[in-house]
A protein has these predicted regions:
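Short beta-strand elements that form the blades of beta-propeller/WD-repeat-like
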Residues: 4-17
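Conserved residues at the C-terminal ends of beta-strands
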Residues: 11, 83, 185
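Structural motif
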Residues: 16-24
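Cap/lid segment of the alpha/beta-hydrolase catalytic domain
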Residues: 26-30, 35-162, 167-170, 174
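A conserved short beta-strand
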Residues: 177-187
Length: 188
């Protein structure tokens, strides 16, 4: 039976690291890579900088932002800021091959881990839904303003789909001058 196994599988990726699958032997405490996601165009994770920064929202809450860019990307580069913040769904800062083209052309990619998701637990989720939904929108706007203030970006494109599309529409209505461009996929 599986519960008698002497090894486990570990899956790992980051915004710069394609998915790695390890076998980890419990008794020996040793791991080995058994599978690595292949990128047909080639990929060197050492060419990228990853950062986790925190923006302070309207009520003092620290909002995490995950950022990836090429090491040679200048300050104030165009940025694509993604957000969701609904249904307790955490947006993992994992690898996506579809982002590489933008990042390799000098854009910054950022994920705003706003309230409504579960990134910081159940209270984080509860403080971004129903009567507290405005927190999600304010958190997202705060993240964009933080990226500008820290000279990470001047021009920010925002992106979200479904409930994230609602986030994009609300953020544009609340603070239209904060954003350069917006993509609201299937908003409701």
């Amino acid at each position: 039976y599986e519960y008698e196994s002497n090894k486990i599988k570990i899956y790992y990726s980051s915004m710069a690291t394609p998915l790695l699958t390890y076998d980890y032997k419990l008794k020996d405490q040793k791991k080995r890579i058994i599978k690595k996601q292949q990128i047909p165009t080639g990929h060197n994770e050492k060419n990228y900088n990853l950062k986790r920064v925190y923006a302070i929202s309207h009520d003092g809450e620290k909002i995490p932002i995950s950022i990836i860019k090429r090491k040679n990307t200048p300050k104030n580069a165009p940025t694509l800021l993604y957000g969701y913040g609904s249904y307790g769904i955490s947006i993992s800062p994992s690898f996506s091959v579809s982002r590489l083209s933008l990042i390799d052309r000098g854009m910054v990619y950022a994920i705003a881990h706003i309230r409504g998701g579960m990134e910081k637990g159940k209270k984080w989720y509860e403080n971004g839904k129903k009567k507290n939904k405005l927190n999600s929108f304010k958190d997202f706007i705060t993240c964009a303003e933080f990226l500008k203030k820290e000279n990470i970006s001047k021009n920010i494109t925002i992106h979200g789909g479904s409930a994230g599309g609602l986030l994009i529409g609300a953020s544009l209505n609340i603070s239209p001058d904060t954003f350069h461009c917006a993509v609201a996929e299937v908003p409701f």
